[in-house]
Amino acid sequence: MSEVERAGGAAKRLLLLVPMVVEAAALRRAVPGATVLRTGVGPARAAAAAVKASRLAGAAVAVGGFCGALTDDLRPGDIVVASEVRGSDGHGVRCSSEPLVAALRERGLQRVSVGPVVSVDHVVRGAERAILAAGGALAVDMESAWLAPAAAGRPFAVLRVVLDTPAREVTRPLAMLIAGVTAWRALRRAGPALGAWAAA
């Protein structure tokens, strides 16, 4: 179920959409003043949350969270800023990427890649990653394309942090824990850039 949280602080320009509780925990304090909406995981919950989010205040809308890399050029903890998000139907929505990348780099975060993020309705493993990568996408998630309508004409950005890669898929609990901690820390470090992007 979706849940709205308000972070402390004065800047209230950003509506931040995050699928999971752990992602919200990473970003809540990192983006003071943002309205944080936990959307739930997967397309059905994301689509329902987008309807709710479209009615919430915020001059800018961003999606933050984890993703799977589609290429081994990326590694766990790397930041992916979407140039566009693509649904499983191939439809794409352009994102505000350059100002966000600049804000990240101003904060010393250099492991940042920009490119398409594709959203699907299932966990992607094995050869399917290569198929999606062949279409030019850098990363995969299960929500961003369904959350995009929430922007409703407002600036829209997607910031995802790599959880696993084709060569380092997380299928065991210990591997998931290690990768999760790495991704969580990177997401927390990236959070202030989202606030700067929204305030620009």
Regions found by a protein language model. Give the residues of each.
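A short, flexible N-terminal coil/short beta segment enriched in small residues
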Residues: 1-15
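Glycine-rich phosphate- or other oxyanion-binding loops that anchor nucleotides, phosphorylated ligands
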Residues: 11-200
